């Protein structure tokens, strides 16, 4: 089983770009969403087109419903129908309960939870056959709660619940799964020391290899019983 009509949000950089590389191949069509990483999106497009992949790029701010609607319209016009949606994009800003703002709260909830829900709804209306997948990139913070990154963690906890409830709702024609990575790629605001401390606090005491996340995505797509 393969995915051939793929949408990846936040697909121009980091984990999203790695997933795009993993799922690319001759005659496959991938729509890569980006927001501020236009040059990286264009470079990735050129790279993947050399493998015979058809790449479509679309810009959008996922905290704005008008942009989400634009992305859906563009996806329908290019792909015609869908068989894989990877909700990878996320907003990641640090705040706590005692200093969060309604603006930050709203942007996190809209970007990290409302948009995956809206895209999942539209995905379900534009599929063919029974081998269709939605894969949500969550976060290990959902299972190891801390008071840090408050708005982000709340939004990802909601995405975890969305994953479980949409799996029930969309079965059997759409399988919905989530991946909750541990420390994978150092955030640009992190020091090397802080990042190392973060992954050493995990049971395996190692940084996650992004290729392992990509392999998990591929496994979900190819295994019709999950």
Summary of predicted features, one role per range:
Residues 12-14:
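Conserved glycine-rich cofactor-binding loop
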Residues 28-42:
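Conserved glycine-rich Rossmann-like NAD(P)H-binding loop of the short-chain dehydrogenase/reductase
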């Amino acid at each position: 089983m393969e995915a051939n009509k793929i949408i990846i949000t936040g697909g121009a950089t980091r984990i999203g770009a790695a997933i795009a590389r993993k799922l690319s191949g001759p005659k496959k069509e991938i729509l890569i969403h980006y927001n501020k990483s236009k040059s990286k999106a264009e470079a990735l497009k050129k790279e993947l087109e050399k493998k015979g992949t058809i790449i479509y790029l679309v810009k959008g701010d996922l905290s704005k419903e008008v942009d989400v609607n634009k992305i859906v319209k563009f996806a329908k016009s290019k792909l015609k129908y869908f068989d894989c949606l990877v909700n990878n994009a996320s907003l990641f800003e640090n705040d706590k309960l005692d200093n969060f703002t309604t603006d930050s709260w709203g942007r996190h909830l809209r970007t990290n939870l409302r948009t995956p829900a809206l895209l999942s709804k539209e995905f379900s209306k534009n599929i063919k056959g029974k081998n269709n997948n939605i894969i949500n990139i969550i976060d290990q913070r959902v299972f190891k709660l801390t008071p840090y990154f408050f708005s982000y963690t709340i939004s990802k906890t909601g995405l975890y619940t969305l994953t479980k409830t949409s799996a029930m709702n969309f079965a059997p024609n759409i399988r919905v799964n989530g991946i909750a990575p541990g420390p994978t790629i150092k955030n640009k605001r992190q020091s090397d020391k802080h990042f190392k401390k973060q992954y050493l606090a995990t049971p395996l005491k190692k940084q996650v290899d992004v290729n392992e996340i990509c392999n998990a995505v591929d496994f979900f797509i190819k295994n019709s019983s999950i």
